[in-house]
Design a protein with these regions (language model features):
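A surface/extracellular/periplasmic glyco- and lipid-processing/surface-interacting theme
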Residues: 1-18, 23-286
Length: 286
């Protein structure tokens, strides 16, 4: 999600987007797509970080990546359905998830490594080669608690301008009351989809605070995706400060108010910002 990699292609189609910090104080994005049929360009696709695998597992999703940090190799080889652009990792060896070089392609409109893409057809073919199921596991019962078709959720406190506090792209969301959605901005401008030119917009935004710490001198991060903590849930120009918890590392995060009731969010698209639990004071809510 650095400046040279934007705008991304196909991100508008994602039902859920996760944004989390990586080394160098930049962020990377992971889109969760329930319906990706017909998508001819998705990306750019970059390398895996371990915590993104945990977030993907919350949705019983196939995890797609091009390469990985060495710290992610073990989890990728631990019965995780993943599709990778690389077949091995120096210092680790063979990796599962490689379905051939035809799964991804590069364009000439921007320099490497920001020019690697895939498509729905390529991913479907890869799942066939790797014998992955495209159906939900029989025990998966969904992630969020959504409002019913005839319901609209609002909270007590107003939140029409919100910032997660990331240092490099300095993103924010502004609420559009006429449409009932939050519009996304970063690098001082509207964030758009490369294919449509449309600005990204979301029915729900979640700031999820996690313990984060460096793994080495290169700044590779560990993000605790299981311990739980504070979260802020935004919808319809309002917000609730709450607590998030998980039953185990692969189960969905659940959000609860101060009375212990699970938070209900509105139907539609959701953007999740993973924030350092030590940087809560950098969050802006207006």
């Amino acid at each position: 999600n650095i400046y040279g990699a934007i705008p991304q292609a196909g991100i508008e189609r994602a039902d859920v987007v996760y944004e989390a910090p990586v080394e160098g104080a930049i962020t990377r994005l992971m889109g969760i797509f329930e319906d990706y049929d017909g998508m001819e360009k998705i990306g750019s696709v970059r390398s895996c970080r371990e915590y993104y695998v945990h977030f993907a597992k919350e949705f019983d999703a196939l995890y797609v990546h091009y390469g990985q940090a060495v710290y992610a190799c073990e989890i990728l080889n631990s019965n995780i359905d993943n599709i990778s652009g690389l077949s091995s990792q120096e210092g680790f060896g063979q990796l599962y998830g490689y379905a051939g070089e035809e799964t991804f392609y590069r364009t000439d409109d921007r320099p490497s490594p920001h020019n690697c893409y895939t498509s729905a057809d390529r991913l479907i073919e890869a799942t066939k080669k790797l014998c992955y199921s495209r159906e939900y596991d029989k025990d998966y019962d969904g992630h969020y608690q959504f409002a019913g078709d005839d319901q609209t959720v609002t909270f007590t406190d107003p939140a029409t301008h919100i910032e997660p506090g990331y240092e490099v792209n300095e993103p924010w969301f502004d609420y559009n009351a006429d449409e009932g959605v939050y519009y996304r901005y970063q690098y001082g401008d509207a964030q758009i989809d490369q294919l449509t030119g449309d600005q990204l917009k979301y029915d729900n935004v979640i700031f999820q605070l996690c313990e984060c710490y460096p793994l080495d001198d290169h700044g590779y991060l560990a993000i605790e995706a299981e311990k739980g903590g504070t979260a802020y849930v935004f919808t319809k120009g309002t917000y609730e400060k709450c607590t998030w918890t998980k039953d185990d590392i692969e189960s969905p995060a659940r959000y609860f108010d101060e009375d212990g009731n699970e938070i209900t969010i509105n139907q539609g698209k959701t953007w999740v910002c993973v924030v350092y639990d030590t940087k809560e004071d950098q969050i802006v809510i207006e």
